Amino acid sequence: HLYYPNFLNRYSKSKGDKEVIRITLEDNIQHPQHGEGYEKRTQYSADMIHQTALEWIDSQNGEQPFFGVFTYTLPHAELVQPEDSILQYYKEKFTEDKDWISPHWSRYNTSLHAHAQFAAMVTRLDTYVGEVLAKLKEKGFDKNTLVIFTSDNGPHMEGGADPDFFGHNAILRGTKRQTHEGGVRVPFIAWGPGMVPAGVVNDHQLAFY
């Protein structure tokens, strides 16, 4: 879950891949993966995955059905991201914040302004989702495409995340890795004009693995 990794994996039949292809992030490997100097890395994996997702939607011609799974990992430890306007906005909003200093045994790097980092990650993900929907509309796919937004588990406490501060689980008990409802209950939002009624909430139970 490092956001400035040494490599990303790709498997694309449309690109002729017959096996997983490892793509080395050449700019990132010029700097340490942990500790001092890590902040000099510039290739942010979440942005790269999102850009590839938009390009993939753009490549669809509408003549054949398509199915895409966009595996965004925001928000998640480690709590780091580009020093852009999204992060700066939240740095100026929190009167109560904290720094999380990485212990020597952790795979996660130190996170300064951890509350602001987490909030900015949520906004960054929201921006990604908005851009995906905008791209579908631009291509004319929004009238016959079903979009599902979901997650894999409840909130976590690693890397400086603070679910109690944000009230993530409200009245639900537990967090990630626990079998209480707070650990296993996740959002599930479906969007599909003409297919899914807007503004409707139901109590249908399902499992997403």
Name these PLM-found stretches.
Residues L2-Y209:
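Active-site-proximal cap/lid insertion segments
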